[in-house]
């Protein structure tokens, strides 16, 4: 895996959850 990409995905996923949006 690519830690950088995974970290970025995790951050964006958390951001979507914070905004009550779904992440596709």
UniProtKB/Swiss-Prot annotation:
It comes from the Eukaryota. Its EC number is 3.2.1.35. GO terms for cellular component: extracellular region. It catalyses: Random hydrolysis of (1->4)-linkages between N-acetyl-beta-D-glucosamine and D-glucuronate residues in hyaluronate. Keywords: Hydrolase, Secreted. One of its GO terms (molecular function) is hyalurononglucosaminidase activity. The keyword Ribosomal protein does not apply. Expressed by the venom gland. It is found in: Secreted. Possesses high activity against hyaluronan in vitro. Belongs to the CRISP family. This is Hyaluronidase.
């Amino acid at each position: 895996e690519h830690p950088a990409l995974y970290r970025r995905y995790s951050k964006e996923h958390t951001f979507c959850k914070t905004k009550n949006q779904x992440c596709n």
